[in-house]
């Protein structure tokens, strides 16, 4: 689940607690990754497989062993939040579709006064598209197939991935976790 604003709070209230590190600092180490965070980011760019491949190659370059952890079932305490997110995504998708129609109409007219409006609509469309992205079963299957081909390890959490990621690091089976 994560704690919203935790990094900001730590930075504001402590000194020298958060340290920036590079990939080279983790050479030869194992890192667990909350897969959904990066899948969402990569789906936003439309080239999710290519971006995931680039990420894996970067790990390989630095001889880092990544272990991707996929979310399992939704915890009871988060079901209301998930339903609210679904509603927001659906609303964003509908607004995106309306903007697409408006965009097409503006493109058809060759009025130069529309240029600013077109740019504004394109930005809104991009924002609405990003906020309507949903990880589908086919995305997960494609990614897992890619991991199998490249020998990348992955686990399926019973619940949320970040809980299993934290346990793996806490138990000393990985040195770090990539998450939000």
Predicted stretch roles:
Residues 23:
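Active-site and ligand/interface coordination hotspots across diverse enzymes
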Residues 2-17, 26-160, 164-168:
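Noncatalytic, basic helical substrate-engagement surface that gates or grips nucleic-acid strands
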Residues 165-180:
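Acidic, metal-binding active-site segment of PIN/NYN-like and related structure-specific nucleases
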